[in-house]
Amino acid sequence: MDAQHLMTMSGISLEQVAIMGCSLGTGLLVSMIIYNYFFHPLARVPGPCTGAIFPFWSMSSLYRRRLNPDLAELHKKYGQILSLLSGYGGLLMCPRNTGPIVRVGPNQLSFATVEAQKMIYNAKPTHTGSDELFGRDGTLQDVLLSMILGAANIGSLSNRAEHKKMRKRLQPGFTSKALFEQESLLRMHMDRLLQGLAQDTGVIDLTEYFSRFLWDLIGDLSFGEPLVPEKHGRRTDTLRSLVGVYQGCFPILEAINYAVPQIEGVLKLALQLVPPATLRAVLPSATFREYDHPAINSHTTPLQCCINRQDGRSDFLTHIMGDKSSNPTELELSYDELHSNATVLMIAGYKTTETSLSALFYRLLSTPGVLEKLQTELFSNFQSIDEITGKKLLSLPYLNGCVNESLRLTPAVAGKFASRRSPGAIIEGFYVPSGTEVYTETYTMQRSPQYWHAPDEYRPERWFERGEGSPYAQDVHEAFKPFSSGPRACLGREMALQTLRLTAALLVYRFHLKIVNEDRFVWEQDTDSRMIYSKYHIKAIVQERLT
């Protein structure tokens, strides 16, 4: 007896079943909206209505690729009214220029204060047995990162103890001693960049030059040799397959993460069930394994050559592997784990540094008077370009001010993608229930008038003119967190800063630079902003100085 016959016997038609189903679905939807907007534990936190009932606000912002400016505007909007802070003891009303807390999703809060930054990212583990006070477990972005890379790495490990162990293994590659040892490698790639710029004529796209330079440099440091020479024509395609897949899924992930909270567990289980060989064949990161070593045979990858190498060279990967000559058992990571870590260092180091370098030269060339002051500082300290070293550049206040100020205005990674899960804690006077996704919005905090004088203006002198009577005396430098903070802060911070300082110093010392901006490009208006920036270009006329 089929279902239709049963319904006929009971006097219920298919049309009535459909109507009842639609009514039930509508009722559940209305109930969810009413609960999220009026009765949810986060209902008293200010924020857009479209964010309270469903993650429509985040989905829209990510789809339109305007995440950083949209979040800044959101915090500003809710800072113009009396920002509502709720704690155990009742309600506290306080006026601020920038709303300290905004509800951007049904179960998601964005903060923009130093206090929240410390609480979320620097808090020590609790005595309750959880991994950490604010953990990464349960964030769908981390699961997706694991899927893309296919093995445990410094970026995807959510367990605090395991992450600490991995970070300790990688840390020797990023110490001051390691940076000094790696400077010759940096200068080798830098010389190629300078030579290419010197030979080019007309209007030059600096961003494209920076992209090639950093791809070769970071690939050399991560895999033991530059990946994908330009003649292969596959450098851009490779990165797009890795980063594009990740970013393109963001709007959908926002909906899935809310509608199916258990999706992370399902994906983690799937990763365990799928054979590693199958994952390697289908994941975008598999393309890194296809590159041939030019000196050996077509079946030997750069990573394997680096593992086999005995020349004592210092790079990221040799520190990951440890000193095999003195302790053969030190190589505790599998090939897949080595590859996964090298890949994540490659992706993170390349794209973020390229963004920061392009943003730095955009500020240098488009802000009146800045380039001239930097030139004066460099020529007064160095008689020739050969005298310029990373160590000497540390003592130049204006150069370091230029770098820091660019990072303040343009942090490479959006704060949303360093989100954590609350274990149930009070942040900014508001009790944040367990499981709530929280993060500090770096872009907003680093442009907040609460912490900075003239927050939207590029003023390198704010970093060294801080004496009595200075307009920058009250600037709060604790609000400067372009590399995040705490145990998961960017491992390559010092390497990135050294690359930015050296590139700026060498280019400004050797060349006359003049921006060409016929299309009136403005960084804040014309770049795409999601997890990272995209669609930016810095065009300039570059002429070698007469010596």
From Swiss-Prot:
It is an enzyme of class 1 (oxidoreductase). Keywords: Glycoprotein, Heme, Iron, Membrane, Metal-binding, Monooxygenase, Oxidoreductase, Transmembrane, Transmembrane helix. It holds the Pfam family p450. One of its GO terms (molecular function) is iron ion binding. The chain crosses the membrane at residues 19-39. One of its GO terms (biological process) is small molecule biosynthetic process. SUPFAM superfamilies: Cytochrome P450. Its EC number is 1.-.-.-. It catalyses: sesterfisherol + 3 reduced [NADPH--hemoprotein reductase] + 3 O2 = sesterfisherate + 3 oxidized [NADPH--hemoprotein reductase] + 4 H2O + 4 H(+). It is a single-pass membrane protein. Heme binds at residue 490. Its cofactor is heme. Its main location: membrane. Glycans are attached at residues 341, 404. Belongs to the cytochrome P450 family. This is Sesterfisheric acid synthase.
